[in-house]
């Protein structure tokens, strides 16, 4: 997996995954065309590439030999990527392929976009400023399973979780290797390999057609799967806030409702990315959640770290991403809170988690039996 990170259009990193045997390097060489104003960027400190080369490499697991896996394309400044677009994730470095886009409403507390929609604050939530929503493109993608071991320390091996399609309210299933990726995190490339991504759903969802651009086109099974499971896959709202150079992005998803004795229990999944935008090394130590339910209850949850980890965010590895779940005995509610971080000197500081809605959208349960 090429593990270079593009930030604000600049890519200049070399990562050594195995100190004894395996090296991965990335060369990024965009020519100045159109509105793409970027310098030529070389991700090699040992002059192992010819200066005219425009490919990124992925090493074979058994040795030092580098093999070509594709050729970079210029990122799209306007418009969206199509189904079948191969890409490298600019933050986590994995290879992936676009399945289809989502048009989300981004609520960014760090800017004041000119948009018509706004999100009101829930009772007791921090802050009082109005937040405007702006349309932003995200993508449902498949992750190359070969790259999952290399990103496990910075991100969970992403999976879409869902409730079982039978009466067992405790059952939770997952489709591993699915992720949601923002438009600016896409580094597009092309490949002549007919199976460039290793994932059990790749050949089920996509087929190779060299006469098309991109050359991987959707099968009917992908269209049917998207249509059938649209309510539970749909990404609608994204919330973002930065405190002392730590940016927190939250994406909630409604999963469905289950009956529990005499009440209904509504379930949501939420994905959180923590990103260090500064140079100082910090470590996440604690989480503090407040969960407000439409039924009138307010719950406080405290704990060490997140998902059993206390990730360190540094300039070399600035981001960490994870997913979790929450349930309410009401069709809607709100969540917000803080993360406590520790600096190198030992002092602590709090980072705000932006308030986000838990909405059921009036959905009724639909089975996820299509893939199984």
Language-model regions: role of each:
Residues 2-8, 12, 16-86, 92-93, ...:
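Mixed-charge, Lys/Arg-rich low-complexity intrinsically disordered regions
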Residues 104-115:
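Short, solvent-exposed secondary-structure boundary/capping segments
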Residues 127-220:
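Intrinsically disordered, low-complexity, charged/polar segments
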Residues 228-267:
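Low-complexity, acidic Ser/Thr/Pro/Gly-rich terminal tails and inter-domain linkers that flank the onset
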Residues 273-279:
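Asparagine-centered strand-capping/turn motif at beta-strand->loop junctions
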Residues 279-299:
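Short acidic, flexible loop segments centered on an aromatic residue
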Residues 299-332:
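Intrinsically disordered, low-complexity Pro/Gly/Ser/Thr-rich segments with frequent PxxP/GP/PP motifs
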Residues 326-372:
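Terminal connector regions
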């Amino acid at each position: 997996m090429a593990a270079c990170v593009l930030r604000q259009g600049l890519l200049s990193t070399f990562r050594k995954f195995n100190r004894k045997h395996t090296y991965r390097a990335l060369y990024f060489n965009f020519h100045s065309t159109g509105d793409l104003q970027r310098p030529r960027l070389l991700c090699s400190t040992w002059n192992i590439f010819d200066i005219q080369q425009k490919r990124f490499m992925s090493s074979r697991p058994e040795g030092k030999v580098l093999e070509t896996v594709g050729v970079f394309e210029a990122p799209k400044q306007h418009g969206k990527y199509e189904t079948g677009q191969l890409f490298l994730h600019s933050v986590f470095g994995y290879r992936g392929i676009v399945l289809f886009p989502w048009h989300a409403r981004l609520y960014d507390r760090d800017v004041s976009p000119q948009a018509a929609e706004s999100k009101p604050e829930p009772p007791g939530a921090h802050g009082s400023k109005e937040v405007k929503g702006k349309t932003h493109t995200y993508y449902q993608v498949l992750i190359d399973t070969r790259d999952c071991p290399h990103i496990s320390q910075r991100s969970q091996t992403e999976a879409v979780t869902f409730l079982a399609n039978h009466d067992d309210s405790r059952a939770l299933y997952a489709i591993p290797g699915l992720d949601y990726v923002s438009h600016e995190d896409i580094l597009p490339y092309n490949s002549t390999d007919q199976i460039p991504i290793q994932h059990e759903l790749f050949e089920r969802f996509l087929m190779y057609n060299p006469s098309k651009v991109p050359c991987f086109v959707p099968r009917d099974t992908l269209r049917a799967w998207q249509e059938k499971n649209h309510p539970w896959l749909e990404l609608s709202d994204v919330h973002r806030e930065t405190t002392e150079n730590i940016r927190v992005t939250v994406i909630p998803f409604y999963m469905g409702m289950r009956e529990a004795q005499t009440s209904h229990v509504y379930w949501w999944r939420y994905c959180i990315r923590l990103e260090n935008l500064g140079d100082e090394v910090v470590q996440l130590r604690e989480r503090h959640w407040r969960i407000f339910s439409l039924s009138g209850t307010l719950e406080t949850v405290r704990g060490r770290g997140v998902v059993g980890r206390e990730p360190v965010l540094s300039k070399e590895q600035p981001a960490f991403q994870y997913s979790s779940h929450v349930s309410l005995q009401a069709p809607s509610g709100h969540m917000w809170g803080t993360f406590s971080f520790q600096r190198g000197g030992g002092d602590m500081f709090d980072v705000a988690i932006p308030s986000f809605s838990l909405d059921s959208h009036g959905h009724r349960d639909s089975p996820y039996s299509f893939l199984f």
